Amino acid sequence: MMRDVVVVDIGGTHARFAIASIGADGTISLDEPETLHTADHASFQTAWQAFRERKGGTLPKAVSMAIAGPVGSPGKPNPVIRFTNNPWIIRPALINEKLGVERYTLVNDFAAVAHAVARADDSQFLHLAGPDQPLGAEGTISVIGPGTGLGVAHLY
């Protein structure tokens, strides 16, 4: 059985939306992502509505959002999430009502990258420096990179 989830990467300049299909075996596939400029939308809710219209008016009842900034901890999101270079405000307590979803997940954008790295196959990596070895099955994964600021995440 496939489950569909709206996945969103929200930064200071862009919000990228896609539909992820998750197979019974855990395999994830994405449809073609759509990039919306945050400056073109007064709020995340209006960007969501624009994406929903592009998808024919119906979206899955679950959303997973990777957000550029602090989101709180699992099960205890920040009551108000603000962006550095984007006037949007997300209030997790209102997500289900405002977006018409039944479930949501919030994660920092670089934490999302760290989770993706943990699932990646060795063939998806490009060796740049240091020992040329496959990623270990255990241990800490660190991800660092530029975005609106300098993003860092560790996955244990």
What residue ranges belong to the model's regions?
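Flexible, charged surface loops at secondary-structure boundaries
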Residues: M1, G56-L59, L135-A137
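Short glycine-rich, Thr/Ser-proximal phosphate-binding strand/loop in the N-terminal lobe
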Residues: M2-A50, R54, P77-P79
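Solvent-exposed alpha-helices and their adjacent loops that cap or buttress functional pockets
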Residues: I10, D132-E138, V143-P146
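Conserved A3 ("GATE") glycine/threonine-rich loop of ANL adenylate-forming enzymes
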Residues: G12-H14, F110-H115, T148-L150
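Short beta-strand scaffold segments in enzyme catalytic cores
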Residues: A15-I19, S142-I144, G149-Y156
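Short, flexible, glycine-rich and Lys/Arg-enriched loop motifs at helix boundaries
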Residues: V117-A137
